[in-house]
């Protein structure tokens, strides 16, 4: 990477880091572009070189945070013995994400119900895909539970279940509705097993 490219990446990262800190402290709606650029120590014009508006930086952060949560969960899954079926692996990953969000309710408030399954709908089994997503895609396609399903059906099922889990996670952890998260986990995991059975 050239020095110029490296500096561009540093500025973009500084903007994302500043926005993330401010969003956690104050909330996205109460944070201005000026506050983000001030914290990042860059000019306001620099912000608009990288992001069209505050919504674009929010989407980039949602993708970054979701990716990190997913990467951590997948790595933990790979290092855990006894997870033989795809539903077991899916439940492990979802549980890992739920526990991370239970420990960090500020992060959960930021994500709200907007977990982003990074590029799952655009993944191809080729070497072009991002490594984490390529690995996930191969695992999903190789599982017997997915036999006979199209890539679109797999995507729809996984994102629907993931969205449902995030919504229940948010409501259960922050609001105690419809029940606390420990009471809701068996319900969620039963739905996941049935969806892939």
What are these regions (language model features)?
Residues 1-26, 30-39, 56:
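Basic, helix-initiating cap at the start of DNA-binding domains
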Residues 88, 100-120, 170-174:
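Amphipathic alpha-helical segments used for helix-helix packing
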Residues 51, 58-68, 72:
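Alpha-helical DNA-contacting segments of helix-turn-helix folds
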Residues 71-74, 100, 119-146, 152-159, ...:
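Amphipathic alpha-helical packing segments from all-alpha helical-bundle domains
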Residues 109-112, 144-191:
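Hydrophobic/aromatic-rich alpha-helical bundle segments in the mid-to-C-terminal region
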Residues 55-57, 106:
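A secondary-structure capping/hinge motif
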Residues 41-51:
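Short hydrophobic/aromatic patch on the recognition helix
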Residues 60, 74-103, 161:
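Hydrophobic alpha-helical connector segments
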